[in-house]
């Protein structure tokens, strides 16, 4: 069995009490696991299997198919994310982006740190449009999908690639609009399906 630090991505109920869980790990990248009786066993899972939670997970790793999740312990559950809808929406969107755009079983340590940093940043504050665009451009860059940033209005996006800290780069309204047009188009082009969390995020404005 293997113990790793993970970020929980989308989670699906299976049958009456089981769950199929997508996890993003530092060591193994994105994995899919089967958590038997996850909705019934608080001793083994403690109700921690929720999207955007940082978890210490013990599981039996399989090269193909679903790994078996044996035990989950809380690492950082970020309860504040669920107290502000803007933060919750952005964290769910970021997790779904990682789930959709990353290959299974391929370590991406820079992206793991980016996602972890976003979740920590959103603790205690509302997620902003600038936070969203910072995450998106860095995610695309890490995955090798970096778009051309060749106009003055896109300069803040270039600056986002030079710092690892959310909240450092300021956007004017025009710059934020230009960044949104570009990134929305680029991300849609790499996604095989519409993102469910995007509707929730955009409904909040």
Kindly label every feature range from the protein language model:
Residues 1-7:
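Single conserved hydrophobic/aromatic residue that forms the stacking wall/gate
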